[in-house]
Amino acid sequence: MQHVPTIAIVGRPNVGKSAIFNRMAGRRIAIVHDEPGVTRDRLSAPCKITDRACKIMDTGGIGARLSDGFAEQVEAEADIAIKTADLILFVLDCRDHLTPIDQSIADHLRKSDIPVILLLNKADHEKQDLNLGEFAGLGFDDHIFLSAAHGRGFSELASRLDGFLKQKGAPLKEELEEEPENGEETALPIKVAVVGRPNAGKSSLVNAILRDRRTIVSNVAGTTRDAIDVPYLHDGQPYVLIDTAGMRPRSRRDTSVEVFSAMRSEKAIRRADICLLVIDIAAGITQQDRRIAGIIAEEGKPCIIIVNKFDLFHPNASRKDRMAEVEEQVRRELFFISYAPFIATSAKKAEGVEIIFKVITRIRRESHNLPTTGQLNRLIQLAQQMNPPGAASGSARRLKIYYATTAVDPKYNTIPVPRYVLFVNDKSLLTDSYSQYLRNKIREAYPAPGIPVIFSARSRVRND
């Protein structure tokens, strides 16, 4: 197997590493995360701007909130880059003076034999390219002025990287994977899990969708024995409907039916990019509905609540009153997926079904509405000023949030789901109520209906 080199992006916070990473990864989403909660702040993705294959890695968070206590963190993260990378891109903000963190990272990188290219970011105008200034004193000969915000300098970077990759024997990308015959990039299908308790109307919903004249469909067995994957094309976008309906295990006991239904739903939820939670509103929201909704929340999946059999729900009342009562029930009983919009349908009559894919498209579009690192930190700091965290029970200690960043797991390759990583004094002090407060603030500033807001808190000791 041919060696695919790794290129590490290092630098202190707020110099533009995330923007550079996204440009190189060909993504307009926040940084792709390899293994959330396991790999600390190392993020990776294939590089899209080069002709030769390589992987880019971001060691985000080096020296967040400078203090004497972070010297070891700087060294540890730089060590990760040195031990795993074939080339290091050291990012600096060309508009700022060198900081102690910049100097510390440079000192550590100079001790290695790994080649380093200085990326002098935020050079939005050509006149900024003329003055290398104090950056020349870092001891690295190779440098590129660029602007991640405007795309300046990336052609030069790609050319420089391809020259290096050729020397390292990196294969051309076409040698690794076959290009589509028509030369066009094929859109990734969005996997949609249709889940819910038995008799909620999942089969009727899928049948109503497949009667749409815009469909191109053939049934093939799914990767599990308890689901059917149904390819479906809607307005040029491919989907895969993961249909758990019609696969009800034979059972003489309703309790067994409930258990097996939940098992099938859980498998479908894990595979899906977005879930359609089908509720029989005429029968009311049940414990089984709440259980399946809980799995969706635990898996951190985008979701739409399909309020089915709406035509049978208080049919003599006005639609406005019925919708108000449905919303009250859904928000009360399924509060833990409050981020999920709901759609009232009658699947048997195919009413409301046409709205589903419009909402999915809107969720996918607005899922990219993510704050930058700077915007996120300003929002978090303002939220703390407006409503400071309370003291822990039986203690005078209070939560302190030092720094925050955003990561997106690569398994969310069609609808990105952000994970907001909070670096705090003690993660045990982050209460559910304060987490919900921060979620609400993020949703107010960066609305993304259908997308969960997930926090990952990490304790950091500061000597200040």
UniProtKB/Swiss-Prot annotation:
Span of domain EngA-type G: 5-169, 190-368
Binding, GTP 1: 11-18, 58-62, 121-124
GO biological process: ribosome biogenesis
GO molecular function: GTP binding; ribosome binding
KH-like domain: residues covered: 369-461
Binding residues annotated for GTP 2, in chain numbering: 196-203, 243-247, 308-311
Xref: SUPFAM superfamilies: P-loop containing nucleoside triphosphate hydrolases (SSF52540)
Summary of subunit composition and partner proteins: Associates with the 50S ribosomal subunit.
Record's function text: GTPase that plays an essential role in the late steps of ribosome biogenesis.
Family statement: Belongs to the TRAFAC class TrmE-Era-EngA-EngB-Septin-like GTPase superfamily. EngA (Der) GTPase family.
Name of this protein: GTPase Der
Organism: Akkermansia muciniphila (strain ATCC BAA-835 / DSM 22959 / JCM 33894 / BCRC 81048 / CCUG 64013 / CIP 107961 / Muc)
